[in-house]
Design a protein with these regions (language model features):
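Short, well-ordered beta-strand elements
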Residues: 29-42, 59-64, 139-143
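Ligand-binding cleft/hinge of the Venus flytrap
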Residues: 50-58, 133-169
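C-terminal motif of bacterial Sec signal peptides marking the signal peptidase cleavage site
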Residues: 18-22
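Periplasmic-binding protein-like
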Residues: 108-116, 174, 200-222
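Short helix-initiation/N-cap motifs at beta->coil->alpha
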Residues: 40-41, 62-74, 168-179
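Bacterial signal peptide processing site
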Residues: 24-26
């Protein structure tokens, strides 16, 4: 799967280079490209890969890290040239509706992306519907990621619609994984907002909780 993802992204980078042909020049005469990224594992990997490949072709590349909303605002304003981690058609639909007239989709880096609530495999429940009866084991909380992330917005809706009697705790992608790792080391129950592709699924034995209401929707594309 890693090889496939890299091949797809190399083809996208060729598209980037064609698009960036008219980018502004830096003081040394090299074309400048600005890549926005959020602290999500797959986006970091793709952005740094693009940086290396573009620099090998003579571009000056600046990586700009921000939360998801400022990234879209910066793209619409022309301050960021590309963002490689947009989840469509659902998760980032609000941003596309708001800024889409100023944006252009170049291609798909990953198909069948998924998001939802994730637990270690030793947790015995299978479904979101079972969370409430075991909420004390989960300390009455769901460990989330960045405020404003599409996954967080979707999870807030999941909590309302089921409903779920646990509180969504914002953090960051890295902090969420740190909480997950500590709980696994101690064989404690934990539920987090998770998604694939993400390296944590290859490092830890995890599972998505079933979503019988399909609140998180179908597979998406990045």
């Amino acid at each position: 799967m890693r090889r496939l993802i890299i091949i797809i992204n190399l083809s996208l980078i060729v598209a980037f280079m064609m698009m960036f042909a008219d980018c502004s020049d830096s003081s040394n005469g090299r074309k400048q490209v600005s890549i926005g990224y959020v602290n999500w594992s797959e986006g970091i990997a793709m952005s740094y890969l693009a940086k290396v490949m573009l620099e090998s072709k003579g571009y000056d590349v600046m990586l700009r890290n921000a939360d998801i909303a400022p990234v879209f605002v910066s793209m619409a304003a022309g301050k960021v040239d590309v963002f490689m981690d947009a989840w469509l058609p659902a998760t980032h639909a609000d941003y596309i509706r708001k800024f889409g007239d100023n944006l252009e989709a170049l291609g798909v880096a990953y198909k069948n992306a998924r998001m939802g609530l994730v637990v270690p495999s030793y947790v015995t429940i299978r479904s979101i519907e079972e969370l409430n009866e075991h909420k004390e084991k989960f300390r009455n909380e769901i460990i989330g990621i960045d405020v404003g992330a599409g996954l967080m917005n979707e999870t807030e809706r999941v909590i309302r619609e089921y409903p779920v009697e646990l509180t969504l705790k914002p953090s960051s992608g890295a902090t969420m994984v740190a909480f997950l790792q500590k709980s696994i080391e101690n064989k404690e129950w934990i539920v987090v907002t998770g998604w694939t592709p993400h390296w944590m699924f290859s490092r830890y034995d995890l599972k998505f909780l079933d979503d019988p209401q399909k609140q998180y929707g179908d597979a998406e594309q990045i």
